[in-house]
């Protein structure tokens, strides 16, 4: 486990050193916000569907065992 941690720190350090001279990357902020909104709406829809299913199962008449 210690070797893995050392390797990870080494890779991060090397990437920081090699990228320090490169031009900063342009991040498409608008696209990230759009995807975030879509994912948020999808998660809300799943949450609402789950809640509706729970309420339905609670109110549904239960079958009696013989």
Swiss-Prot record:
Signal peptide: 1-24
Keywords of the record: Antibiotic, Antimicrobial, Immunity, Innate immunity, Secreted, Signal
Organism: Bombyx mori (Silk moth)
Name of the gene encoding the protein in the UniProt record: MOR1
Presence of the UniProt keyword rRNA processing in the record: no
Entry function: Has antibacterial activity against Gram-positive and Gram-negative bacteria. Probably acts by disturbing membrane functions with its amphipathic structure.
Domain of life: Eukaryota
Pfam families: Moricin
Protein name: Moricin-1
Triggers of expression: By bacterial infection.
Tissue expression profile of the protein: Expressed in fat body and to a lesser extent in hemocyte and Malpighian tubules.
Residue spans crossing the bilayer: none
GO cellular component, one term: extracellular region
InterPro entries: Moricin_fam, Moricin_sf
Protein family: Belongs to the moricin family.
Single biological process term from Gene Ontology: innate immune response
Main location: secreted
Subcellular location: Secreted
